[in-house]
Amino acid sequence: MNFKKFYNKIWNPASSKIKSNDVKFLIIRFSSIGDIVLTTPVIRCLRKKYPGATIHYLTKKKFATILQSNPYLDKVLLLEDNFNKTVQEIENEEYDYIIDLHHNLRTLRIKNLIRDVPFYSFNKLNIKKWIYTNFKINTLPQVHIVDRYMATVEKLGVVNDGLGLDYFIPESEKVKEGDIPFSHLHGYVAIAIGAAHNTKKLPVEKLKELVEKIKHPVILLGGKEDLSNGEKIAETDPIKIYNACGKFSLNESADIVRNAKLVISHDTGMMHIAAAFKKNILSVWGNTVPSFGMTPYKTNYEVFQVNKLWCRPCSKTGFDKCPLGHFKCMNEQSMDAIALTAETYLGKEIKN
């Protein structure tokens, strides 16, 4: 510890600084899209509790766009390829408190290297998840992950304001009228066809069946890796269905979700972005399960899953393909049920 830090610890201890609001926080969550969006209530509520505080957030570079327009943050730090450089940057910032919402080996290393800063670490419940996925015994608390994130900062006096998730889109990345077909300007259903793992995604043939049954214009959302599947689905009706996969940035895709009449999504980041905009969501689950505590937060939603499958959940994240080869958790999903629910929600939306 250098002399300046030593002086500050003696004459300006964190406990006294926090009472005066003259306090500096670092929040850590490296990935991924949905997980970072799910931490946004912590950012907002921390700011409400300590309006005069300095609040920074450390994440991976590819996810920085999720946070860079967040008005409750003062700075977004990027995880460097050189880990020691990241640790040095954290030390140079002289934080009073570090809020670890990732709690992995990297954050443990940070904690071990920066011993003079109080750490508040999120409980990931990995052992309980392992028991659930391997033995199908659910001992997880029936608590949403957002509320578990909030529990991490309870000792700092931070209280959940109940306002849900945040997602802020800069004006420069909002979608213009000319960016989507004229046929979709008066309303559309956004379907997020992607996911980080294939076992979280409906097969293309199932999605083709779904869009055939939906009577309203549809915009397909996903990354460049989903472009080919999007083209196959859009072939069903090229006028009704617009394949936006790989054509827009994350923030632009978020804006398309923001303006949608209804969002249909797998258990993925776009579902949580939709929840931030308080959209009605039809949430389709494959190998993962809602009881992991990551359903859409503080918005209207319906869950679609194949119940009473002995093999679910098979993973807390997902696989490239079904470990048993049958993929019943998605192949047995009813597209009639999803389409009927979609039309019900859309009917209410039009009447309003």
Where are the model-predicted features located?
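Catalytic machinery of carbohydrate-active enzymes
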Residues: 1-352
